[in-house]
Amino acid sequence: METFRTLLAKAALGNGISSTAYDTAWVAKLGQLDDELSDLALNWLCERQLPDGSWGAEFPFCYEDRLLSTLAAMISLTSNKHRRRRAAQVEKGLLALKNLTSGAFEGPQLDIKDATVGFELIAPTLMAEAARLGLAICHEESILGELVGVREQKLRKLGGSKINKHITAAFSVELAGQDGVGMLDVDNLQETNGSVKYSPSASAYFALHVKPGDKRALAYISSIIQAGDGGAPAFYQAEIFEIVWSLWNLSRTDIDLSDPEIVRTYLPYLDHVEQHWVRGRGVGWTGNSTLEDCDTTSVAYDVLSKFGRSPDIGAVLQFEDADWFRTYFHEVGPSISTNVHVLGALKQAGYDKCHPRVRKVLEFIRSSKEPGRFCWRDKWHRSAYYTTAHLICAASNYDDALCSDAIGWILNTQRPDGSWGFFDGQATAEETAYCIQALAHWQRHSGTSLSAQISRAGGWLSQHCEPPYAPLWIAKTLYCSATVVKAAILSALRLVDESNQ
């Protein structure tokens, strides 16, 4: 297993986000502009078609991920020359698409409350394009009927403004399709690196339909595809995200922040985050981002404060709403994990448990619990262990009764081999690491002895700590942040050693 030193060096590159079939399919459509890029992406897609003919994450199954990925891949494969060259993949894909949209489909169906990022905006556009290409979508009207209301609600949030790089909808700019470019502020979409909101799929759409052949967008995409294996990640670059989450995981362990050697090791990474922190606004995924978010800002505030820096809490407070904190402006539904991380930032800032802001966040979290069990699911991560474990770390001292109940749920769901997994089937190293972090934190905080459970989990994790890791994180489709997951695992293994001492 790597060390935190080597992990942070990787995090600083910001390229730890896994490739997705959805984003890669958009790059594969660029054949008319760049044959080499298109062919590399197409090869990646065809090598990763699932046994049932669909595309997306094999585990865990997510209907929205599988539908968007398969639609995007099939649109790419049936465009121009690809259909003849990849006839076998097309035939299997057609069957998979029929099965996914059939009323007889066996498995989780569309749940708009549990959808991937921008699904209600993107899916109707892709389905319309698929129809133009002659791809049959069963029950199309039924699926679109569930999406239309949420799509309209989200677009109303824009208040008539055109989509530009300062609005979150830019991340899903392909929602405009071939005929909706009028929705876009065309000259104010690109970031300094040529991308549209650091999204390969949005950038490919831009190069195809907004500014055809745009050299800056194509250069951004080429830099990713040529440096990898032909796949395109869910987003790139994301070094602030990867650094602050790696440091947050490190901070769960018993490190001596007064040790000059430790300070020197982490100095350049803390400096990088602090240099890009904008007073009153915070940070986004990457240092050059034009859009800050409450989640990254809250975690960065927590980390910078713990390591002796002085960020301003006002950057977190700007996201405060009447009943919760928003991740982004124009957000339709709140994120539980973002509010959990706000709670951690408020604690680090010295807010008392009786402060109205703390009480507001706690009330929102209490009201958002999964029915019938003491756990929480969120729109940024598929597993309830992520949000629940982070809640225990953030809410201790604020609401110990809530934390105790959440600890009970974690203990009751530990598998006989010591691992955890929220979904039927396999347990994962990532989820097991989060649970170890929560148990170790609660053991230190409450004095409750949990060494046996932690040790059992550590034994399993030490045998299952290497990649590949399941894509449990949520963007337009599911992805994995390998650097962040490795940091969580390394943190958990350290905590196991500390618990045994």
From Swiss-Prot:
The keyword Lyase applies. Belongs to the terpene synthase family. The lineage of its organism: Bacteria, Bacillati, Actinomycetota, Actinomycetes, Mycobacteriales. It comes from Mycobacterium tuberculosis (strain ATCC 25618 / H37Rv). Keywords: Isomerase, Lyase, Magnesium, Metal-binding. It is an enzyme of class 5 (isomerase). Monomer. Strongly inhibited by 15-aza-dihydrogeranylgeraniol and 5-isopropyl-N,N,N,2-tetramethyl-4-(piperidine-1-carbonyloxy)benzenaminium chloride (Amo-1618). Inhibited by GGPP concentrations higher than 50 uM. Optimum temperature is 30 degrees Celsius. This is Type B diterpene cyclase. Its EC number is 5.5.1.16. Optimum pH is 7.5. Enzyme activity is not detected at pH values above 9.0. Catalyzes the formation of tuberculosinyl diphosphate from geranylgeranyl diphosphate (GGPP). It could also react with (14R/S)-14,15-oxidoGGPP to generate 3alpha- and 3beta-hydroxytuberculosinyl diphosphate. The keyword 4Fe-4S does not apply. GO terms for biological process: cellular response to magnesium starvation; geranylgeranyl diphosphate metabolic process; tuberculosinol biosynthetic process. It catalyses: geranylgeranyl diphosphate = tuberculosinyl diphosphate.
